[in-house]
């Protein structure tokens, strides 16, 4: 009796509400218990009625049927969930298509500086009355102005600026009184605030506003120790500001000109970018007040119109928005739905890319390492030609900074530089220096529990940094990264720190998070179905009798599912996992040279007979039978029997002769995956394919050697060899990264090239990650539910 008809076909509602027929994957005639450590269904009353060969054949066939059921869309899917997924995808596409100069929240502080500008036509009234209207309409219930997240620095600065603006134009005295009451009640509490949350230039901006307030006869308590401390910081910083230098070349000081005295505006106007000073509305408003410059006016008119009277703390922020939005889609594991939009984003960024790097907005005269690092990383990942020269101006004496001349080390800036450095090509020494510097700095911050950033208040920055340090780029399996980032990403709740707190609406977005969770749950449900079918195959092939553990079975499937994770890649995923399992099973057999030769000869001879006659000649060796049946089923309907048999024959010959099994296994996996994915056989002879095959198999050999040496190094006898091998691995991975992420005129598809990196990455992951860490990853990726 067929297992699919032996009992009724119950269904279970899996993750995301996907109704799934259990009988397509699970043999219901046996009982199971669940192992919480691995998520394994352990057999408790198993009685196999078939011999290994026929049972295995049917088990493989059922696994294939399960895969094809999923692949061809026969699995019932909750229509409401599917409709919601489509809606979210389309909504995000519309967001990307509408990207312009940046969707960013309004800053009351900057709006107040704009509102202070007097009509340059000489009427005596405000140049921007709608800015005053915005201020009057946006006071909070407690009398303050600011972001919905309460940070006292932000609230005090915004509130004082708005009170000064309204008082200047003798408007809304009741609102001013309410705002001053908030300031009076809270200003002394600044001493208790975390300095990492202090907005950019706060120690300059607040004293400037207090001085303005005094001229308007506004009483601000300024005798407290906290205010005196801020004034002391201002005086110290002003003494360090090279006033002569800032008039000679662009510096980051252009972002915070408001309130500064003794400025030579004729010289500073040469440093405008599209009318603004480093895209700062408040700085530009201050310049307009002093210069009546037409370009400043045009810039502010555009910004005020865009934001209905208000202005952000920076505008435009187009480079920032384009890059960070793409980064979020990638890390959440949903970038595959938006390839066209991502290409358009990166084409836009590359249009304004320079060998000195970029800033948060296009055509800026100052660059920063944070945006430059993110841009470098994403552009290199997508095959754009970018030079490492962008990092030169951020390095001095072996240390790296966020902005030239400022040796500050914001966590996120160093984190993104670290991530960029991991995409180094051979001989890119400055990236090696950057990786060492940032890794050490981030590690020190981690061990001292001081991962707090000056640029963003996010859900779990320590977790993001920990993942980057613990799972390097070479070992970061796509589904593993997505699973962790789903918990670390705060969506709409993440808030950035500039001159004031602000939101990047297309960077920190609940819509991304909603789609990512739906997508992950769907993939996880598919993977759990496949895993159940894999266990059935394992039992019916009696692989346990050959010494293969259920943990090895699970590890093989996890590696494949964490890399080729998309539901439509079932064939590749199962072929990858099954090939890995059979390789391990065969290698674990303790056979003499003669027995190995007999094993190989039997496989070769029967494969020839079966390929010629289209039959199923039964071998005498049970494991040979398992192998032949598996190859036959993997090739079914594809016409790749001969190619798969040849790939296995090559691996078996290497095994028989005691050759390099790491290299041979990599070649076998690549051929199997490519044949299973339907890659045209002509691609196998492509020069780039051969280059990638050689580089991948070489580094996989080194990784397998490292893994074996590390296992033997417990006695401390092979540490020198481990060091040498590690150096060779790093060199090999750099060469492979260059081959994969560099576009040539006659190139392979990016998906084909990526498959080589996927195999190398899987070897790297298993070689470097401890077993207990891998076990926790398996549980998290395959079995732990997304909340």
From Swiss-Prot:
<keyword id="KW-0809">Transit peptide</keyword>
<feature type="short sequence motif" description="DXDD motif">
    <location>
        <begin position="368"/>
        <end position="371"/>
    </location>
</feature>
<dbReference type="InterPro" id="IPR008949">
    <property type="entry name" value="Isoprenoid_synthase_dom_sf"/>
</dbReference>
<protein>
    <recommendedName>
        <fullName>(-)-kolavenyl diphosphate synthase, chloroplastic</fullName>
        <ecNumber>5.5.1.28</ecNumber>
    </recommendedName>
</protein>
<dbReference type="InterPro" id="IPR050148">
    <property type="entry name" value="Terpene_synthase-like"/>
</dbReference>
<keyword id="KW-0934">Plastid</keyword>
<comment type="similarity">
    <text>Belongs to the terpene synthase family. Tpsc subfamily.</text>
</comment>
<keyword id="KW-0150">Chloroplast</keyword>
<feature type="binding site">
    <location>
        <position position="368"/>
    </location>
    <ligand>
        <name>Mg(2+)</name>
    </ligand>
</feature>
<dbReference type="InterPro" id="IPR001906">
    <property type="entry name" value="Terpene_synth_N"/>
</dbReference>
<dbReference type="GO" id="GO:0009686">
    <property type="term" value="P:gibberellin biosynthetic process"/>
</dbReference>
<comment type="function">
    <text>Involved in the biosynthesis of clerodane diterpenoids natural products, including salvinorin A with potent agonistic activity on brain kappa-opioid receptors, thus conferring hallucinogenic properties. Diterpene synthase that catalyzes the formation of (-)-kolavenyl diphosphate from geranylgeranyl diphosphate (GGPP) as the first reaction in salvinorin A biosynthesis.</text>
</comment>
<keyword id="KW-0460">Magnesium</keyword>
<dbReference type="Pfam" id="PF01397">
    <property type="entry name" value="Terpene_synth"/>
</dbReference>
<dbReference type="GO" id="GO:0000287">
    <property type="term" value="F:magnesium ion binding"/>
</dbReference>
<feature type="binding site">
    <location>
        <position position="370"/>
    </location>
    <ligand>
        <name>Mg(2+)</name>
    </ligand>
</feature>
<dbReference type="GO" id="GO:0016102">
    <property type="term" value="P:diterpenoid biosynthetic process"/>
</dbReference>
<feature type="binding site">
    <location>
        <position position="454"/>
    </location>
    <ligand>
        <name>substrate</name>
    </ligand>
</feature>
<dbReference type="GO" id="GO:0016853">
    <property type="term" value="F:isomerase activity"/>
</dbReference>
<dbReference type="InterPro" id="IPR036965">
    <property type="entry name" value="Terpene_synth_N_sf"/>
</dbReference>
<dbReference type="GO" id="GO:0010333">
    <property type="term" value="F:terpene synthase activity"/>
</dbReference>
<feature type="transit peptide" description="Chloroplast">
    <location>
        <begin position="1"/>
        <end position="47"/>
    </location>
</feature>
<feature type="binding site">
    <location>
        <position position="237"/>
    </location>
    <ligand>
        <name>substrate</name>
    </ligand>
</feature>
<keyword id="KW-0479">Metal-binding</keyword>
<keyword id="KW-0413">Isomerase</keyword>
<dbReference type="GO" id="GO:0009507">
    <property type="term" value="C:chloroplast"/>
</dbReference>
<dbReference type="InterPro" id="IPR008930">
    <property type="entry name" value="Terpenoid_cyclase/PrenylTrfase"/>
</dbReference>
